[in-house]
Regions:
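Enriched for short, Lys/Arg-rich terminal
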Residues: 1-6, 16-26, 56-62, 66-83
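Residue-level recognition of specific faces of alpha-helices
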Residues: 14-17, 32-35, 47, 75-78
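A short, surface-exposed loop/turn module that caps and links secondary-structure elements
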Residues: 31-57
Length: 83
């Protein structure tokens, strides 16, 4: 089952800003986010406490997202990079 990936405005804005600083990392990050459509809970992703939020680390990049099984959606909440 393929999920629909939805980017929240804050995540899109931050991704665009970080893409200017690290184009190669941004390309890999975008690829990983697209892959969440096929596997919303990949190996290496961690659930944050008992919440519905998940974090995925990719080198210096972090992706905070929320898979919603009832609507078959993955909502990308925030994208960040470790300084």
């Amino acid at each position: 089952m393929t999920y629909t990936v939805v980017w929240q405005h804050q995540a899109t804005t931050e991704f665009r800003r970080l893409r200017q600083l690290d184009p190669a990392g941004a390309k890999e990050c975008a690829s990983v986010v697209r892959a969440l459509a096929e596997e919303p809970r990949p190996p290496g992703a961690r659930q944050l406490g008992g919440s519905a939020y998940w974090r995925l680390s990719l080198g210096d990049w972090r992706i905070l997202y929320q898979p919603e099984d009832d609507t078959i959606t993955v909502i990308v909440l925030k994208v960040g990079r470790i300084p």
